[in-house]
Amino acid sequence: MNDGYANLICVLYQCNFLTESPKAVVTIKPDKHVFRGETVTLRCEIQGGGDTEWTYSWYKKDYTLYPYRITQEFSFSSVINYNSGEYTCRGWRRSDSQSSEISDAVTLTVSDAAETVVSVSPLHWLTEGDSVTLSCEVKHSSTGWTFSWYTVVPYRNGLIEVTGRRGNVLYGLELLSDSSRGSGGSYTLTNVTVNHTGVYMCRAERGEPVFHTRDSNLQPLCITGESPPVSLIINPSRTQHFTADSLSLSCEDQSDSTGWTVRGYTHNETLFECSSVSGSTCNISFLSTSHTGVYWCQSESGRRSNPVNITVHNGDVILESPVHPVTEGHPLTLRCLYRNTKISDSGVDFYKDDSVLQSQTTGEMTISTVSKSDEGFYHCKHPERGESPKSWVSFRVFHS
């Protein structure tokens, strides 16, 4: 068979096998893993297909989704879980009816909600001068997000309002003036001061129209300094308390005792709102475990006291330990209390960082001269009445 005859046969039967078919490739924006409500766009690219006009066929799994589309793209304006699946495409060139190879399958996954998670490194309890980085991550997705950072404060006009399930206002969000809105999900504070004490959270967004994630978890930062402008005074003066007891928290400023408010963040991730206030003193008449958390004083201008960790225990034994850091070289006394009465009828073990430090029959122990190495988590244990929660005991350097 001569070449002319072969070419004639090929023309008659429109054979395309003499040239290699171009390959179709599917791309998905903003990401292969998206969330319900986002706008998703699929695009079919013909590699090596030139700029000639193509018609596109789209397939989901094993059936035809859109048979003949002139445009390369199609979109879900508000994606739902049903749209999850494997997608492929193929092109048909209208000038000569040549088809591309079908693309490799690309899987689109649609999840119910976009959740952000804040973590902190190295620690959330810091000393003035330290540096700390808060990281914001969108669960199961890392592409195309921009992030904004906020502090959580009592709501006032002009702030973003966060409401509960019943429509009640929980708190307000105040955008940080130096909030990073770039693609990086981290927020770094260098040379922190006590005024950085507070509760932080992040939001992420992407796409057009803009899609917002849910608010992140709340992340407290607690910073202690040597000379804060005000002190949080706790009465009774200890960090652990029994349920059903009463407690007062007051802000004591040597120059001005007004203009300060007690703030708090409890362990069930809620801002503390004092229901009984007298001047700068907050009175709690009936403690519950929900009061466990971090507390500090704050002025309208943003000045803060050192934060204090308060633990409310529903057991029978607590540890009486100092509220504020003890000066190095001074003595430290710890007591084991049984429903507000010092245990003295039998042996009590005192622990530091889960190792027995002393065993005492008096219900109290003393370190005559403390140093930085004595810092740690302390608790006490009675053989019959139980053990206390742990409390962090810190020390500060003496300056003459």
What are these regions (language model features)?
Residues 29-34, 121-126, 236-241, 321-326:
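Short beta-strand segments of immunoglobulin-like
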Residues 46-62, 138-153, 255-264, 338-354:
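Solvent-exposed loop segments of extracellular immunoglobulin-like
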Residues 33, 38-46, 131-138, 246-252, ...:
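A short beta-strand segment in extracellular, disulfide-stabilized domains
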Residues 63-71, 175-184, 272-279, 354-363:
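Short beta-strand segments within Ig-like beta-sandwich modules, predominantly Fibronectin type-III
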Residues 88-112, 199-225, 294-314, 379-399:
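Extracellular/luminal immunoglobulin-like beta-sandwich modules
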Residues 2-8, 35-39, 69, 79-90, ...:
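Solvent-exposed loop/turn motifs of extracellular immunoglobulin-like beta-sandwich domains
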Residues 1-27, 111-118, 220-235, 245, ...:
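N-terminal Sec-dependent signal peptide, specifically the hydrophobic helical h-region
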